[in-house]
């Protein structure tokens, strides 16, 4: 959420494993039913691109009791190395858990992520550890807020200038350039990240 008066942004992070009603679509993008499934599957249950983004936004809105959502911005993780390096790298402080991704990620050390290391930082999770997605979600918040802070340091219009070469390749959004640049003018309160109440449980084998 964005407070236009204080210029502060607060993040609501929703677990990809959240079980909810997912709309299903045929090959033309027309809705034909619903299933109870993980939130992350909504994109795949549509036809891709902007239509899948719209479907995901619609599902999230219903999950949040029809809370208004002003737009969507979807980034393919495959584009992280290029976008990251276009900014000259993104610096984050490492935790003890991050050493599992790369031994160079020492706890307490600030590391400027470059190339594939940036992608691995936001994508990695140990599939042998139950609920390892929680740690990945925490890293993703740290990374995205650091990326926006870096973009802001380059000037008011840096964020859109940064991503514009990658719009067709890695990004789907219904936001225009001015709206995207406005996002980089906010201070994001990473110590106040909200999430949905719930419990992560193992599914049936």
Residue ranges and their predicted role:
Residues 1-205:
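Non-catalytic, solvent-exposed segments at the cell envelope interface
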């Amino acid at each position: 959420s964005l407070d236009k008066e204080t210029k502060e942004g607060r993040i609501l992070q929703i677990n990809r494993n959240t079980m909810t009603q997912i709309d299903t679509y045929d090959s033309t993008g027309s809705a034909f039913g619903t299933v109870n499934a993980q939130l992350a599957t909504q994109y795949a249950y549509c036809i891709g691109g902007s239509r899948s983004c719209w479907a995901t936004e619609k599902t999230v809105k219903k999950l949040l009791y029809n809370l208004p959502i002003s737009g969507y911005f979807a980034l393919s993780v495959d584009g992280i190395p290029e976008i990251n390096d276009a900014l000259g790298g993104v610096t984050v402080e490492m935790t003890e858990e991050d050493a599992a991704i790369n031994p160079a990620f020492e706890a307490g050390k600030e590391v400027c992520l470059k190339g594939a290391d940036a992608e691995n930082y936001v994508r990695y999770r140990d599939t042998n550890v139950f609920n390892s997605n929680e740690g990945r979600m925490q890293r993703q918040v740290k990374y995205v807020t650091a990326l926006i802070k870096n973009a802001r340091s380059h000037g008011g219009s840096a964020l859109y200038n940064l991503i514009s070469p990658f719009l067709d390749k890695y990004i789907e959004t219904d936001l225009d350039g001015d709206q995207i640049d406005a996002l980089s003018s906010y201070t994001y309160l990473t110590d106040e990240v909200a999430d949905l109440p719930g419990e992560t449980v193992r599914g049936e084998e």
